[in-house]
Amino acid sequence: MAKEIAKSLLDIEAVTLSPNDLYTWSSGIKSPIYCDNRVTLGYPLVRGAIRDGLINLIKEHFPEVEVISGTATAGIPHAAFIAEKLKLPMNYVRSSNKSHGKQNQIEGAKSEGKKVVVIEDLISTGGSSVTAVEALKLAGAEVLGVVAIFTYGLKKADDTFSNIQLPFYTLSDYSELIEVAENEGKISSEDIQTLVEWRDNLA
């Protein structure tokens, strides 16, 4: 599954690699990889495979789940697809409270006393996941864990989740993706070294 998802992300250019002309993330980090999983929404077969893959992760690791929660904004549609398929309540978590109305940070199904799984599109450092998890816990939820489409495999993410003692699982990761990219002829063996060094240095 990991390689199939990685291939799909590369094929539809949801993930692009540029070892010699780095992208700049919003955080200012210079990176040879850019991931925009919102692109998957335009490809029904890909988004369906992602939905089913994430459902399999949930059934395997969190079978007692009662509420599906998406992180705003990119996690929301995938959470909706999953909740619909599983016939479960759903909500989503903003990065901060609204500045108007009821000033809610969580919209949708009530979380209090419920076992919740958080849906992310991408895990880089794990920061946005922690924000969502903390908001849900504050609302009285029992957060079981996080599932996501893709992770860069950074040590910082492992440390972040370890610090809050919460498991996370992804459909594919950076190592799988660059291996698939090399096999597909999208990058050279020299590029592989550059990509691995970037990840290790950033970690």
From Swiss-Prot:
It catalyses: orotidine 5'-phosphate + diphosphate = orotate + 5-phospho-alpha-D-ribose 1-diphosphate. It is an enzyme of class 2 (transferase). InterPro entries: OPRT (IPR023031), Or_phspho_trans_dom (IPR004467), PRibTrfase_dom (IPR000836), PRTase-like (IPR029057). Its cofactor is Mg(2+). Orotate binds at residue 124. Pfam families: Pribosyltran. Coiled coil: none annotated. The keyword Ligase does not apply. Keywords: Glycosyltransferase, Magnesium, Pyrimidine biosynthesis, Transferase. GO terms for molecular function: magnesium ion binding; orotate phosphoribosyltransferase activity. Catalyzes the transfer of a ribosyl phosphate group from 5-phosphoribose 1-diphosphate to orotate, leading to the formation of orotidine monophosphate (OMP). This is Orotate phosphoribosyltransferase.
